């Protein structure tokens, strides 16, 4: 049996793909840096071997699946070529693998992971479903009918896929280290649209997505009356959100979701639209929506005493606004304290004022040093540049995390795509120590 070796196994796409292959009965191992990432937990639960990067990890007879962040001159990839081991990039492997299923690719600047998790949960209540989610979780089923996957636009990686369905949640300017402008982003989505085989499910409230041209039907969802699937009569409470769905102006069904914020309604509409297209009944959809528990690092709550700590992956101004809106709905009478760690210097520079504006929607904002990516470790600006634009903000470190204790009974939003979890871990330790003191 071939051993699949994942170079960069802790990656947000690589980890779930390794889980999927393992669940399908394949022999899997991988390597990465010797640093904890939340994506490794499900790997360890399966006892999948994880090594530190080393050329000696590569043996004859393996197939190496290489993460997109690692160049061809990575020591493991050099060794693989030296001994004639096949190397296949993550997105190319996945593009070939999904051909065995009814594939549903979820893409968009924001909402990919949440929508993928919800789609997998709902469709999985109808027929066996394999899924790959960007929160580091994946599952494979030997007899799966559907394959639900998160598809990222960065470096146009999603063009390796020819899915049956593409769900497009929105188009927004992000990844400024790669995309030149919004037109460049749009062109990537337009290219993907031409590769879809059955239908495109797109948010019609997004003006960029209204321009999409395709060889297959484009079915629109949203709040606007011009959409094919429309949410009406929205009722927001501290328990969740209830709304009616109309299909081409005819009442379809009423749904309740234990989720918060307008973006959650839109994500759910995307799922409902796909399900209706595949003939899944409203009863099945509603039953599955009721039991949805969310995905990792997307509004993940921890209660300590009368404090609420929320972990969220928000790392773009649009996502920060959505997270704060969700918190306002669920905790309307509580102080909201944002703790934000910017992710990459290029993104921080490109959206500096927009970050300041979005973070100002919280009652108080604390900032952590900028988290550089594997592609960049320093930049021309510092966290002080952002702090100077947010009135009353402060820069914090893990050592000085106890400053947060002055906000008793607050909702603390820990946001970022780097290692912001270490700030939450430090604060949790302080709170638990205070409880036992």
Swiss-Prot record:
Organism this protein belongs to: Lysinibacillus sphaericus (strain C3-41)
UniProt key word Transcription regulation: no
Entry superkingdom: Bacteria
Cystine residue pairs: none
SUPFAM superfamilies to which the protein is assigned, alphabetical: MurCD N-terminal domain, MurD-like peptide ligases, catalytic domain, MurD-like peptide ligases, peptide-binding domain
Protein name: UDP-N-acetylmuramate--L-alanine ligase
Gene Ontology cellular-component terms listed: cytoplasm
Pathway(s) per entry: Cell wall biogenesis; peptidoglycan biosynthesis
A biological-process GO annotation: peptidoglycan biosynthetic process
Family assignment from sequence similarity: Belongs to the MurCDEF family.
HAMAP family per record: MurC (MF_00046)
Pfam entry (one): Mur_ligase
PANTHER family linked to this entry: UDP-N-ACETYLMURAMATE--L-ALANINE LIGASE, UDP-N-ACETYLMURAMATE--L-ALANINE LIGASE-RELATED
Membrane-spanning segments: none
């Amino acid at each position: 049996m071939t051993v699949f070796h994942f170079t960069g196994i802790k990656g947000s796409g690589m980890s779930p793909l390794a889980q999927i292959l393992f669940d399908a009965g394949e022999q899997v191992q991988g390597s990465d840096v010797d640093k904890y990432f939340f994506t490794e937990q499900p790997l360890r639960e399966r006892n999948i071997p994880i090594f530190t990067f080393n050329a000696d990890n590569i043996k004859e007879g393996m197939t190496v699946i290489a993460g997109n962040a690692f160049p061809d001159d990575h020591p493991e990839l050099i060794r693989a070529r030296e001994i004639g081991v096949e190397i296949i990039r993550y997105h190319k492997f996945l593009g070939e693998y999904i051909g065995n299923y009814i594939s549903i690719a979820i893409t968009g600047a924001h909402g990919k992971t949440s929508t993928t998790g919800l789609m997998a949960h709902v469709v999985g209540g109808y027929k066996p479903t394999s899924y790959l989610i960007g929160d580091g979780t994946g599952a494979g089923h030997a007899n799966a009918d559907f394959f639900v996957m998160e598809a990222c636009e960065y470096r146009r990686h999603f063009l390796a896929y020819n899915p049956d369905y593409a769900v497009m949640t929105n188009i927004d300017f992000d990844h400024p280290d790669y995309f030149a402008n919004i037109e460049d982003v749009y062109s990537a989505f337009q290219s993907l649209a031409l590769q879809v085989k059955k239908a495109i499910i797109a948010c019609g409230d997004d003006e960029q997505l209204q321009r999409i041209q395709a060889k297959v039907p484009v079915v629109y969802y949203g709040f606007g009356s011009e959409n094919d699937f429309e949410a009406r009569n929205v009722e927001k409470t501290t328990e969740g959100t209830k709304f009616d769905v109309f299909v081409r102006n005819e009442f379809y069904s009423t749904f309740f979701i234990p989720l918060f914020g307008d973006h959650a309604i839109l994500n759910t509409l995307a799922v409902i639209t796909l399900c209706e297209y595949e003939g899944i009944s409203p009863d099945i959809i509603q039953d599955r929506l009721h039991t949805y528990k969310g995905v990792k690092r997307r509004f993940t709550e921890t209660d300590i005493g009368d404090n609420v700590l929320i972990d969220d992956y928000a790392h773009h101004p649009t996502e920060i606004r959505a997270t704060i809106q969700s918190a306002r709905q669920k905790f309307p009478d509580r102080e909201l304290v944002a703790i934000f760690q910017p992710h990459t210097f290029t993104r921080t520079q490109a959206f500096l004022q927009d970050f300041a504006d979005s973070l100002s929607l919280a009652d108080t904002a604390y900032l952590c040093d900028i988290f550089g990516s594997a592609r960049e470790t320093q930049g021309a600006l510092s966290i002080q540049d952002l702090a100077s634009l947010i009135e009353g903000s402060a820069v914090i470190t893990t050592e000085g995390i106890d400053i947060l204790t002055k906000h008793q009974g607050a909702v603390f939003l820990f946001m970022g795509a780097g290692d912001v979890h270490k700030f939450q871990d430090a604060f949790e330790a302080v709170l638990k120590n205070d409880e036992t003191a």
